[in-house]
């Protein structure tokens, strides 16, 4: 018993659809992932700040200024 298989050539339209599908997965999902990570970081910072676990501002000390104050 032989099985008859018929191969249908891919049309240009189906190839274009596949290219867009793979591009959306490989380019769109990493972008969406980055956006969600950014929003999560903003939310976490706001949440921690509202609990009072972190100072309201960041202090940056310069070595030159520190040496200038000591002199």
From Swiss-Prot:
Disruption phenotype: Abnormal localization of atg43 to the outer mitochondrial membrane. Severely decreases vegetative cell population growth. It is found in: Mitochondrion outer membrane. It comes from the Eukaryota. One of its GO terms (cellular component) is MIM complex. The chain crosses the membrane at residues 22-44. One of its GO terms (biological process) is protein insertion into mitochondrial outer membrane. The keyword Flavoprotein does not apply. Keywords: Membrane, Mitochondrion, Mitochondrion outer membrane, Protein transport, Transmembrane, Transmembrane helix, Transport. The keyword Mitochondrion applies. Belongs to the MIM1 family. Component of the mitochondrial outer import machinery (MIM) complex that mediates transport of proteins into mitochondrial compartments. Promotes the insertion of tom70 into the outer mitochondrial membrane. Promotes the insertion of atg43 into the outer mitochondrial membrane. The MIM complex cooperates with the receptor tom70 in binding of precursor proteins and promotes their insertion and assembly into the outer membrane. Involved in import of the subset of proteins with multiple alpha-helical transmembrane segments. Component of the mitochondrial outer import machinery (MIM) complex containing at least mim1 and mim2. Interacts with mim2. Interacts with mitophagy receptor atg43. This is Mitochondrial import protein 1. It comes from Schizosaccharomyces pombe (strain 972 / ATCC 24843). The gene is mim1.
């Amino acid at each position: 018993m032989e099985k008859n298989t018929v191969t249908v050539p891919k049309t240009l339209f189906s190839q274009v659809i596949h290219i867009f599908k793979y591009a959306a997965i490989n380019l769109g999902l990493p972008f969406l992932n980055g956006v969600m990570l950014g929003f999560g970081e903003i939310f976490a910072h706001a949440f921690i700040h509202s609990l009072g676990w972190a100072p309201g501002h960041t202090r940056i000390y310069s070595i030159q200024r520190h040496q200038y104050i000591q002199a």
